[in-house]
């Protein structure tokens, strides 16, 4: 479940609000006209707190929201969902490139037609 209220993107707030050692997905953004505006979607497959504390955009975007997940697969799937939701609704994100599968895992995006076509092509190639 995503946090209902955006948090300030500062090291003190991140350390207080984000539990160390848990994977998760996050959105960096800003408040415009009283609403949170998505600007960057990302994830950590191992420790969301560390990812946010060391993020290149730590001081560029003033707010973040996040959700914990159980593992790297779920982090990839939720990041992909949020990324596709933004693109499908005309939201321009800073990160235009589709989320990558976690290291050493060949996961396919469940929301992406390209990913589905690639999976089918690989399956057909292996079967022949």
Segments and roles (model prediction):
Residues 1-38, 43-128:
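Boundary/linker segments flanking structured domains
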